[in-house]
Amino acid sequence: MKNKWFWILSIIIALIVTYFTAVPKNETDTRKEVTVWTLQMGDFADYMNNIISKYESAHPDIKIKWIDVPFSEGDKRTLAAILSNNPPDLINLNPDFSAILAQKGTLYSIPENKLSEYNKDIVDSLKYKGNLFAIPWYATSAVTIYNKKLFEQAKLTDMPATYEDLAKYAKQVKVNTGKYIYLPTITENDTMLKILNKYGINSYSNINNNESVKVFNQFKSLYQNNLIPKESITQTHREALEKYMSENIVFFQGGANFLSMIKDNAPNVYKVTDVAPQIKGKLGQNDFSLMNFVIPLKAKYKDEALDFGLFLTNKENQLALAKRTNVISTNKEALTDSFYNSYDGLMSKARSISAKQISHIQPVMRQSNNQKDINTLVNTAVQSVLLNKDNTQNILNKLAKDWKNLS
């Protein structure tokens, strides 16, 4: 009897096992998997996942695979992916590296009519040979951060608006306060090139013209007369910020995000801090930094990537990100929002100024394949001029020749 029940139970178990192994638990996912890379957005996972969830609900045939990449690995991993046969469909990059990839012919050309809702100046900055290579996401634009107490002690009556103004007021500041007017980080990366671009100087063909000599000599005069710190020849934004927080300089150029650092690390200085528009050159345009999305030419789902990219960067989603991070939207409608056009504090004032500056950025500085080498040449020339190693014209003539040889 026991054997009989044992065999019956064995048959039942076998039938159950056969049933569940014969019928798959899940049907195959037939959705298109669009791979999206972002840079350093891990702290905003809830923001990204909410957008992805909304998009997938509206597009049941699409699955978004989101991967966040550290800033330090962005260029390297992107280059490796671009060279492979299976790159991500949508990649978050800075415009400089994006432009280099566009020059190499590795990016999908985005139809310009798809970006009619975005800031035109920014869209125009994302073109190579007339072809649009990226979707703008968010931007920042430096403002002039200054110490009101030192401003008054220096007996200044007008805010400096140009580099010429800074040079003009430098001695007055030094005499009345014993402090420096600012620390120009003119040998940091492409800082000097960005300044020169504000005077229409942007290539080896005009780096040694009269206007360029004048700009270089202006910094030379400040340096030789001890009206800017001697450290200007080597130091970066980090050291300039430290000098501002220790009240050794009156003015500091930086994004609104630096205000948070000042507030946290030098609260007494923050109490006497105010902001004004960015320092300009002869042409009157503003510098800006941008994050954008590109679509590799080898991407499997280019149309789907473009559609998701446009959704991710629409007015609603850009404003939601801006309210979390204080960045500047690139969507024209978003920029008309009261978030950018009214303020009740220092942070919001800086944001409002930055947002207005985004509409005046042309001509932008164009990056080259060998930009780091060009930066090195220019920064070496800056040091030679400041140290008076030769007359400025000779130094710039050599710079023009060396730059041309790189091209």
What are these regions (language model features)?
Residues 1-98, 158, 280-283, 303-304, ...:
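Conserved N-terminal structural module of periplasmic/extracytoplasmic solute-binding proteins
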Residues 98-100, 255-270:
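A ligand-binding cleft/hinge motif common to bilobed small-molecule-binding domains
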Residues 53-58, 63-65, 224-227, 264-328, ...:
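Extracytoplasmic/periplasmic substrate-recognition and gating elements
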Residues 348-404:
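C-terminal capping/gating helix-and-loop segments adjacent to ligand/active sites or protein-protein/ligand interfaces
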Residues 54, 59-121, 149-154, 161, ...:
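Extracytoplasmic "Venus flytrap"/periplasmic binding protein-like
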Residues 94-143, 165, 175-177, 270-279, ...:
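Hinge/lid segment of periplasmic solute-binding proteins
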Residues 170-172, 205-236:
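Glycine-centered hinge/linker elements that transmit conformational signals in sensory
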Residues 99-106, 122-159, 184-204, 287-295, ...:
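Periplasmic solute-binding protein
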